[in-house]
């Protein structure tokens, strides 16, 4: 008898590649406590979805803004997501915006303030979903990134951006509200996002994936997400096709 099929055998390790986020960290903790082993690798959204497409992971954590930036953001994942073979597990809504020092001493209120000569910015790394969202917003408002002091100074997590500002090395950054609160920074909300786990549809009925879904749908997980500043668990646990998730499913592009 195969070890994995024996009665009482430990659940198979779930390989999760995910963009950094606080709901993901909460999921990891609760999954581990429930006895489900998770091999988590934090990487940017595009790398996470690409790894799922190549069969290198079982779940891919990525985020897409709601509203006017949804379509161009979703389109970027079209190279790897397939409407027939992939499904999305809704993890959480979250709010992205500007981190500034307590009391906002420089009077930063919008993206246009990032171009001011007296403002030092710290960015996320190239390829991160958060940086992609910021660049879409800058383009809409016709703000040239080259005019932003510190645009090429990068950190790899929301917390690292917040810590950089809290330590006095920058005046403003862009990320999720939870990180700003944890480092006692003020926060200026600019965008709402949905965070998803992408999964192969055929794996949804496997025991390990059923346990993933059970954790995400549990009251304890939803309650924990609600406690995170800027997070909302309203649709947490919903399983969606790409066309259900987006007004138009991302077109799978030719390789």
Tell me what each language-model feature is.
Residues 102-109, 143, 202-207:
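Short helix-loop capping/hinge motifs at secondary-structure junctions, enriched
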Residues 46-60, 65, 154-169:
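Short helices/loops that flank or line small-molecule/ion binding pockets
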Residues 1-57, 75-86, 106-111, 139, ...:
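N-terminal hydrophobic or amphipathic helices and topogenic motifs
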Residues 82-95, 185-214, 235-240:
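Periplasmic-binding protein-like
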Residues 26-34, 111-112, 124, 130-151:
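Ligand-binding cleft/hinge of the Venus flytrap
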Residues 10-20, 112-131:
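Short loop->beta-strand "edge-of-pocket" segments that line small-molecule binding or catalytic clefts
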Residues 63-77, 162-191:
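A ligand-binding cleft/hinge motif common to bilobed small-molecule-binding domains
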Residues 91, 100-121:
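Flexible hinge/capping segments at coil-to-helix
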């Amino acid at each position: 008898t195969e070890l994995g099929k024996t009665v009482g055998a430990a659940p198979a390790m779930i390989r999760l590649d995910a963009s950094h986020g606080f709901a993901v960290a909460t999921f990891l903790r609760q999954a581990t406590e429930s006895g489900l082993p998770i091999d988590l690798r934090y990487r940017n959204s595009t790398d996470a979805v690409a790894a799922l497409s190549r069969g290198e992971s079982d779940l891919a954590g990525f985020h897409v803004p709601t509203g006017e930036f949804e379509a161009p953001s979703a389109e970027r994942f079209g190279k790897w997501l397939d409407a027939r073979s992939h499904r999305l597990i809704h993890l959480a809504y979250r709010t992205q915006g500007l981190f500034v020092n307590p009391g906002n001493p420089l009077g930063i209120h919008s993206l246009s303030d990032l171009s001011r000569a007296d403002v030092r910015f710290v960015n996320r790394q190239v390829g991160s979903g958060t940086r992609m969202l910021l660049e879409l917003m800058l383009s809409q408002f016709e703000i040239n990134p080259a005019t932003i002091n510190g645009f090429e100074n990068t950190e790899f997590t929301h917390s690292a951006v917040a810590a950089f500002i809290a330590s006095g090395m920058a005046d403003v950054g862009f990320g999720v509200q939870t990180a700003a609160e944890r480092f006692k920074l003020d926060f200026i909300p600019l965008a709402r996002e949905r965070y998803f786990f992408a999964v192969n549809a055929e794996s949804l009925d496997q025991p390990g994936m059923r346990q993933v879904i059970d954790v995400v749908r549990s009251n304890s997980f939803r309650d924990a997400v609600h406690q995170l500043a800027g997070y909302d668990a309203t649709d947490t646990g919903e399983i969606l096709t790409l066309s259900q998730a987006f007004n138009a499913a991302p077109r799978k592009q030719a390789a």
